[in-house]
């Protein structure tokens, strides 16, 4: 299948969203040296992609879906759209991308009132969507280290859990010259998520405070020391996460008319990447219409919602102090990618209309109820997946989505990462600051069949019979 291997290479530059300054892509840059704003990466030769027809691009990407070439099996199936400067030998693949889109169970679909599906990004290698961006960021670092013969590069990130798990996993796989350090807000990462960077051998540091505090520390490091920052300020990560848009379009046979995407905002990197990806597809004619994109935020961390809720001429950006949220990955009061969101949302609305991009607010109670309801119907949604379902329900109630449309919800991580919140719900143990009261219809707890002493007091046959009888009575079974 050598005919599917990329032959087109490009030149790339960092483009500052503040002063429009440009810098070469072969350097570790995260913010503009001139004005301090964030970057987007741009392929200077992007116009050359128009030399191939939209139909040919679709056919090529469909052919690559069957490829056994390692460099094309993950997010780099869309190599020319992502990072066409990289060499195949540097591309890192751990099984990321190409995550399943699972239609809502019929009973759940009927409850909600329109056709929708989950894209299960929790089925990435580290069990979250972050692997899309890390695959690109680490491929770039391999390429850069090889070009410069660097002997050691420290990769650093602040995290609420998923970023650290992903960064540590990819650093462990690549190995020298890369080493991983992660900084976490003490006590605000689930035990399941904490176990991941520890298991991958990263240096794990904890800091009192919240994610925003950790972010300021690693930003200071990146500005004053030669380290590789792996948060979404890293523009290479945004490129890898664009693959979500490309996969979504390809799965729907490049027809995204009447499709509404619901995406948790968090640090705003993912919604940035998805808009950027669809804008590229639209510019090249691979999709004829843009899907509508709804960012979703909890009322406990909703700066982007507040910005867009204001009249257009009265909007001012204002970070917020976050309150505890079960959607931990989205519990960010000052998302670093907001300047990208604002810039790309302008372009997205210009191309798709005023209703093409909107932000929805949800309550913590709605997030937990929606997550449990989804998983009660056979899904594996995390709290962010619950946030998206709650956003869909609210959008329907507000008349922002019609029942003739279809929706795709982003389950950013695997539900097992948030088993602790499920346990708090089932045992009614949430602290008052969350504002969550369990719905008895969604709560679930194990029931004891026999007292613990029964195992030692009864012979095997009697023990089995007594347990079976207790089970039959509990389940109201009728004898044959």
What are these regions, as identified by a protein language model?
Residues 263, 364-421:
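Claisen-condensing/thiolase-fold acyl-transfer catalytic domains that form or cleave C-C bonds
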Residues 139-147, 165-177, 279, 390-400:
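Alpha-helix C-terminal capping segments
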Residues 131-137, 156-174, 190-192, 267-274, ...:
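Short glycine/serine/threonine-rich phosphate/pyrophosphate-binding segments
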Residues 221-285, 368-373:
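Active-site/ligand-binding-proximal alpha/beta "capping" segment
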Residues 98, 193-195, 205, 209-229, ...:
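Active-site/ligand-binding loops adjacent to catalytic centers
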Residues 147-170, 177-185, 257-267, 293, ...:
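A short, small-residue-rich loop immediately preceding and capping a beta-strand
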Residues 71-147:
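Positively charged, low-complexity intrinsically disordered leader regions
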Residues 2-93:
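N-terminal juxtadomain amphipathic helix
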């Amino acid at each position: 299948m050598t005919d599917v291997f990329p032959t087109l290479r490009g030149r790339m530059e960092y483009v500052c969203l503040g002063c429009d300054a440009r810098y070469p892509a072969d350097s570790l840059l995260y913010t503009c040296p001139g004005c301090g704003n964030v970057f987007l990466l741009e392929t200077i030769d992007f116009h050359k992609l128009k030399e191939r027809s939209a139909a040919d691009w679709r056919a090529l990407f469909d052919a690559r879906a069957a490829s056994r070439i390692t460099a094309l099996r993950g997010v780099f199936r869309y190599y020319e759209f992502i990072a066409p400067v990289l060499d195949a030998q540097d591309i890192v693949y751990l099984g990321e991308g190409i995550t399943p889109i699972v239609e809502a169970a019929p009973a759940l679909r009927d409850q909600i009132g329109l056709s929708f599906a989950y894209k299960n990004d929790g089925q990435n290698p580290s069990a979250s969507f972050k692997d899309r961006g890390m695959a690109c960021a680490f491929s770039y670092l391999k390429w850069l280290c090889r070009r410069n013969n660097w002997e050691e590069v420290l990769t650093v990130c602040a995290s609420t859990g998923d970023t650290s798990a992903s960064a540590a996993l990819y650093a462990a796989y690549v190995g020298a010259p890369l080493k991983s350090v992660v900084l976490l807000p003490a006590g605000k990462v689930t035990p399941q998520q904490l176990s991941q960077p520890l298991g991958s051998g990263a240096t794990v540091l904890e800091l009192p405070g919240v994610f925003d505090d950790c972010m300021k520390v690693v930003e200071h490091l990146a500005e004053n020391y030669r380290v590789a920052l792996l948060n979404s300020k890293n523009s290479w990560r945004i490129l890898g996460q664009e693959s979500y848009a490309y996969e979504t379009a390809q799965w729907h046979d490049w027809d995204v008319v009447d499709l509404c995407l619901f995406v948790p905002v968090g640090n705003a990197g993912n919604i940035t990447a998805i808009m950027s990806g669809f804008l590229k597809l639209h510019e090249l004619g691979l999709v004829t219409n843009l899907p509508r994109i709804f960012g979703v935020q909890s009322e406990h961390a909703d700066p982007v919602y507040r910005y867009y809720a204001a009249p257009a001429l009265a909007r001012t950006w204002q970070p917020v102090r976050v309150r505890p949220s079960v959607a931990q990955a989205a519990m960010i009061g000052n998302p670093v990618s907001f300047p990208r969101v604002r810039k790309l949302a302008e372009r997205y609305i210009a191309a798709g209309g005023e209703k093409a991009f909107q932000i929805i607010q949800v309550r913590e109670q709605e997030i937990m109820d929606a997550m449990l309801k989804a998983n009660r119907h056979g899904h594996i949604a995390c709290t962010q997946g619950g946030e998206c379902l709650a956003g869909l329900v609210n959008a329907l109630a507000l008349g922002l989505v019609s029942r003739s449309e279809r929706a795709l919800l982003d389950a950013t991580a695997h539900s097992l990462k948030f088993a602790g919140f499920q346990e708090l719900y089932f045992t009614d143990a949430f602290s008052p600051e969350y504002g969550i009261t369990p719905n008895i219809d969604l709560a679930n707890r194990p029931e004891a069949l026999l007292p613990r002493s029964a195992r030692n007091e009864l012979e095997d046959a009697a023990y089995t019979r007594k347990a079976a009888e207790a089970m039959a009575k509990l389940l109201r079974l009728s004898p044959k």
